Amino acid sequence: MSESRKLGEQERLLNYLHGFGGLIAMSVLHIRGRLDPSLLQQGLDWLQEQHPILRSHITYGGLVFRSVPPFVYRQPSFVIEGTGRIPLRVVNDPDPEAWRQVLATDLRTPIKRGKLPRLRVTLVRQSANSDLHHVVVCADHATLDAQSGNMLSRHLMEFLADPAAARARQPIHASLPPPLEDGLPRKPDSGKRPYQPAIRLPNRPLPRPKMETRVIARRLEADDADRLRSAIKTNRTTLHGAVTSAFLLAVRRRYGLDEMTVLTTIDLRRLMKPALHPETYGCYIDILRTKNPIGGDLWGTAKDVSFRLISTLARDQQSASILKLFDWEVYRKELGGIVSHRRRIDGLAVTTAGESGLRRDYGPFELADVTMAVSLDMFGPSLFIIGSEREGGIDLSVGYSASAISEEEVTALADDAFTQLGGRTG
């Protein structure tokens, strides 16, 4: 660990994509209570003390040459010295839905280069006397994954509830933790898995296309979520398998497809040697593509999804990973589909972030809801589903680009999947 280090291979790729508006990571905390902007800024300052990545900026050094696009780039590095505070902007707008426009704008606006952290925050409220506040967090995906996003939200809420207790907490890391590649064993590759091209959702009429990432949110409350967890245990599968299966079956009913590729985010902290502390802040993921037949019922499909993902991770992680620069084979097989399908790189992506640790009550504040999203305008899957557990319930955020698929299509797919999982759409 040190006061500076080069970005790892995946951090470098994600930072590069961020500069073009790709995979910008967002979350929104919907908070009830009289939240003073100065207290929120104190919380952001404290987060920087706790997490070295948050008190670092990125510099760009010598040239690196490659045989595939981009053929040349400057080597990026995290540097702690000289980094400024996390910027906080306050928006007062009488429109109760103004936070959605802030979210949409941030999702297509990369964080500028310079000596600021790779995170920015906007506090959206109707007025200075409002009881409901929306804390919109925008991050460079090179510095944050879903687990880190939940941790940031949890730590910030804990500070707001009791600043003195939070300040007494010792940081997990005193300086920058290592990149993924430094501690990860070589990715398994049997050599028997050819490149798997994406299977995309069919194009449907799009009467009002708009370059804007949007989110449809659904929540399974605790009683419905408990029934789902019991069924998952009985059927020997996972929450990821169940959520993916529900959306696959919804796709089959709506489009008549009998197979589909799925992008799945995998947390790799525990696979590193030595294993990273579970509260290490940063981006420690891979994204794997698997091809899944769509047949049978919810639970049969869920078990098949889980089996294919586990076997791919164990045997063919290297070839199944999409978190790497495209080579010429990928360009040959994917460029036409990306162009003809409104810049979609796949049909579905599913991330299940596990238990967030977030609760409703935080001293004088109440966490009313949480929204999570990833920018999909420049490119991405048709649907990006993020599942996270909170206070016994399960939150589902279904992201999509309004330039690629209509709200009516996404709502129909989300409601179908949600109903299969035991949710109540009425």
How would you name each of these model-derived features?
Residues 43, 132-133, 213, 228, ...:
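Alpha-helical hydrophobic/aromatic positions enriched in membrane-embedded helices and signal peptides
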Residues 156, 160-164, 251, 309, ...:
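Short, well-ordered alpha-helical segments in soluble proteins
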Residues 31-52, 137-154, 218-256, 396, ...:
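Acyl activation and transfer enzymes in specialized metabolism, enriched
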Residues 1-15, 22, 91-93, 143-230, ...:
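Non-catalytic, low-complexity flexible loops and terminal extensions
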Residues 30-34, 91-162, 166, 175-183, ...:
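Histidine-centered acyl-transfer/condensation active-site motif
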Residues 69-88:
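Structured interaction and signal-relay segments at domain junctions
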Residues 1-67, 72, 96-119, 252-426:
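Acyl-thioester-dependent acyl-group transfer interface
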